[in-house]
Amino acid sequence: DLAKTAPELMGKAGALIVGEPTSNEPLLGHKGAFWLKAQANGVTAHGSMPHLGDNAIYKLARAALALEDFAFDTPAHPLMGAATLNVGTARGGININSVPDAAELTIDIRTVADQDHAHIYRCLCNKLGSHIQLSTLLDVGSVYTAPTDAWIQDVFAVCAQHLGVKPVEKTVSYFTDAAALKAPLG
């Protein structure tokens, strides 16, 4: 909370170590997490008269299929790999014999270094069209330090001395506290 409420107290840092379950292997960063909710609205009607309604689940189903083949316009990162998109949940309707007037799904996007979440949002809005409303649930940027960084080189050298082998240069797909601490620490 200090990073959010009083960033001026954090000071500047030359390096940051975040404790994560990595089997004591140093990591160079993590992917970002961009979670969205996609909502479709319709008009309810009795299930025996669907022509009097507007089925929100049909709209949402088309959106889910469009998301399945969404292509990011950012190339894969050499260590982080490619950005990913997953539809995690879908909900809609109130019962079997009604045309649903609302439906929603959640989207979990994992981004690579320097990928712009606002740009992804705009691309998804264009892809899904005006029948789908997007809202942001979580927006956590990626964190990455190049393996050529002097401090990283020192860390890898110390690890090599103690472990007998130089650590592998890698990142992880989950996000860590480093994302929250990066901005206030400079």
Language-model segment annotations:
Residues 1-35:
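Acidic/histidine-rich catalytic neighborhood of metal-dependent amide-processing enzymes
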